[in-house]
Each structure stands twice: as C-alpha cells, then as structure tokens.
C-alpha cells in the first residue's frame, strides 16, 4: 500500500504540469477504451449481480450495482463531458496589484493524491478517476467487494486509456483486494502521500472514514432530503416533482425521504400522496393525514430521521414555512431540501433560513447531482462547510496558491 502511495505521489507531480490538451486527450482515450471493452465490463458486472443475488442484497443496492448498455453509454458520455470542461488548473480566481507594485494572483492548483473508498457503485470508478485526472490529481481507488469484478474491468479500461495517451498509469491505481486492512492503511494517509479521502457508501463506511481518517475528508453521512409543499404551490407541479424525487431512483442520496405539507392546504395536496401510493410507494404519515386516507401507515418518531433508499416516504403536516424549517433543522443531514411554492416571499424565507448544501425551488431533489449541475460528473455530495460543499466536481478537487510578481520590492 505504501508503495502504491509513492507511485501515486510521483504520478501527481507529472499530472500537475500536464497541459489541458494532454488531459483532454487522455480522457478521450479512456472513453474509447470503455467502448472497446464494453462486453468485458458488462460480463464482469453480471458476475457481481449474480453474487449480489446469492447474498440477498436489497433491491435498491442491486440497482446501484447494476450496469447495462444504457448506463455504460451514459458513463462514457460523462467521460466525454468531463473532457470538454474547462481545465481548472491554473485558473486565476482573483488578482490585484498592491500600492507597492506587487501583483498578487490566487491560482487554482491540484490537491495532489486523492483516495476514494466506495462500495457498490461501479460508476464511481469512472467518475472519480476522470474528475481527478481532469483536475490534475492522482487517484487511489478502493472499491467494495460487491462491485469488485466491475471495478476491476473498468480500471483496466482506464489504464488502457492512460497508456494510449502517454500518461503514467500510476495516475489511477486500484487496490486489488477486498481486505479491510487496506482501508485502514489509506485512512492513515500512506506515509503522507494521500492528501484527501472521499468515501462513497453507506453510513457505516462514512462514519468509519470520518472517525479514523488522519487526512482531510470530503463526505456526507446521509442523504435525508426534504420537500416542503407550501399552500401556494401548484398541485400538478407538486405531484410531478414529488413523484420524480421519490420514485425516479429510490436508492440514490438525492431521493426525497420526507415530504412536509402546509397544514392549511392538506386536502388540496392529498392527490399527490395518493398518486405515490398508486405507484407502489408506502406512505408513513402523521395522524391527521392517516385519518383522511386510512390506507397510509402511521409514522413513528424514527421515520423522520430515516434514509429509506426505497419506495417509502414519510409525510407530515406543518404550520407553514416556519414549521417546515423547524422540522428540517432538527432532522436534516444537510444534503438537499426543496420547496414547492408560488409565493416568492415564502421561498426567500426558506432559502435564507436553511443551511443545507443544496436548496431547490420548484424542482426535484434528484437534481442534486454533479452532472445536472454541469460538472460533467461528481465524486459525491459534500455536506461539510470547509473547502468542498455540494457536488464535488473538478473545481472542488483543486486548492489554490498565491503567486506574487514583483520588480525588486523589499519590505520596509
């Protein structure tokens, strides 16, 4: 593992000075390699799916693990989108000239070596690697046992693309073991060679990384997303948004888990909940809602802090936007919250009073995604307040330095 860290550090030194065109070319070669290796990748993924079924993996987790031709094509498109993004390295964030003539520039620089620890999502192998490459960083990947065959096949395509582009294959390395001791070694920083750790997975993984890591961590613990439906909301819009936010993909961190409805307009928005139930979603609601629709289940206290990642939704009535804010502040994981409303004043209160990483107005929480932000892809959603926050794209994978140019100045 420590040798891997040293190789990554040496590769990072090369990537830091590679031109934007070289990186773009490497990403284009990776996309071509993924296309040429498609059959092998899907075959490897099928082996992971067979193992998952034998291990009685939950349906939502199998959905995360699954690759098909459509998802693989989307993955390849994402690589090409990343290739076409502006290169963040060397961008001048700000610049000014002091009265003494010193010209100061704040310039983006790579972070260095990024360790990515993840579980069952094969796309993380590609998204993380390509975002790191675009931002001039080396990557060390440690996938989970559930996606081992998929990740290995995808990494082979990555290495092929790097080699064709003339870049060091050590720029993207994969830990080829499922031994958990490897995670522990990465969390220690591999003798100072890892600069940042990014975990992608369940709460147990993220908690371990956050508690044991000796290097900075970009992470979110849970995607407990809320939607507040104000009395001023359009019913049809609310229906479309909530159905999408819950059921488009139930197993992703941007799926809504709790819907809060303005108590003054409960009957107006009952059709939204009934439509969800008709689509197979279990509704767990407060007593006033269940009294109107007895086929709904009665919610308990634990439901408000539950990330279901399934076709289950908690629903509660609240006293307007103030009640919604009070509930969200108490239970939110700081990931994503949405408000459906036509009253601009209510929207401003919602935006100004909540401090989650992503806030939306009249839009599905499933837009909490780097690709939807125009980032090409993302490594994850960071809910901390230091450095990276929200979708982690190429800019969030850079640091900065101050470059100062003078003409002989000395300090008096």
Swiss-Prot record:
Its EC number is 1.2.1.41. Pfam families: Aldedh. GO terms for cellular component: cytoplasm. Catalyzes the NADPH-dependent reduction of L-glutamate 5-phosphate into L-glutamate 5-semialdehyde and phosphate. The product spontaneously undergoes cyclization to form 1-pyrroline-5-carboxylate. Keywords: Amino-acid biosynthesis, Cytoplasm, NADP, Oxidoreductase, Proline biosynthesis. It is found in: Cytoplasm. Belongs to the gamma-glutamyl phosphate reductase family. It catalyses: L-glutamate 5-semialdehyde + phosphate + NADP(+) = L-glutamyl 5-phosphate + NADPH + H(+). One of its GO terms (biological process) is L-proline biosynthetic process. This is Gamma-glutamyl phosphate reductase. It comes from Bartonella bacilliformis (strain ATCC 35685 / KC583 / Herrer 020/F12,63). GO terms for molecular function: glutamate-5-semialdehyde dehydrogenase activity; NADP binding. The lineage of its organism: Bacteria, Pseudomonadati, Pseudomonadota, Alphaproteobacteria, Hyphomicrobiales. HAMAP family: ProA. Pathway: Amino-acid biosynthesis; L-proline biosynthesis; L-glutamate 5-semialdehyde from L-glutamate: step 2/2. InterPro entries: Ald_DH/histidinol_DH, Ald_DH_C, Ald_DH_N, Aldehyde_DH_dom, G-glutamylP_reductase_CS, Glu-5-SA_DH, GPR_dom. It is an enzyme of class 1 (oxidoreductase). Its main location: cytoplasm.
